[in-house]
Amino acid sequence: LALTYAQPGNHLLLAALGQEALENTAEACRKKGSEATAIEFDLSKPESVKAFTNQIKKKHQKVDRLVHVSGISQRARAEEASIDIDRKIMEINYFGAIQVTKDLLPLLKAATNAKIGVTSSISGKFGFPLRSAYAASKFALHGFFESLRLEHYKDNISVTIMCPGRVNTPISLSALNAQGKAQGVMDPGQANGIPVDKCARQMKRAIEKNKKEVFIGGKEILMVYFKKFIPPLFYRIAKKTNPT
C-alpha cells in the first residue's frame, strides 16, 4: 500500500515492527521519487506508540493521510484461548490503532481534507470460527471509526473502513493459536486469495474517493451480503465452510 502512495512530492512515514523490512519498503518508495522514513514501533505497547506519535508531532505540522494496516489474526477456539490472548489481539488491532489516531488528530485537523484509512476485515462484519477475539477487535474498529467520522466531518476528515476478505499475505502465518504462538502455517484460503497489489490499489482508490466502507476480495465477500439480507443462508454456509 505504501508503494501506491510513493510519488514525487509525497513524504511517507512507514511505521511497524521489523526495521529491516521497513527500510526495504522505504527504499522502494524512494526509488519511485517519494521521501520515505522508516520508524520501528510496537503497537502492542502503549509507551512505544506514544514515543512514535510524539516523534511525529515534534517533526511535522500536519498529517494528510493516516492509513492503518497493521494487525494480528487468530486461529483458535474461544474456549481454548486464554483471556491474555484476547487482550493481546485487542491491544494490537484496536487500542494501538485508536491511540495512534487520537494522538495524531491535531495534525489531521491541521491538514486540508485529511483522510484516514482503516484496515478492518470481513470478520468485522460477522463472526467466524477460530477468530472470536480477532472478529471482536475488528467490530470494535468499526464502532470507533464510524463515530470518529461523524465527530470530525466538519474538520473535513474522511474515514474509510476497508474490509478485505482473503488476500495473499502472510497474515495467517503469524495468527495466534490457542497457546498464543504464531501458528506458522499458510492457510489455503489465504494462499489462494487475491494478489496483495490488487488489494492495495483498491484500498487507495477507496481512501482517495472518500468511500465510507469497501469490501475487497473474492467470492467470500458475498458472505457479507448473505449475513445482512439472507441470514439463514449465511449461517448454513458458515457452518460448512473450512475456517482456514
Map each language-model feature to its residues.
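Active-site helix of classical SDR
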Residues: 101, 137
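Substrate-binding pocket helix/loop in short-chain dehydrogenase/reductase
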Residues: 77-88
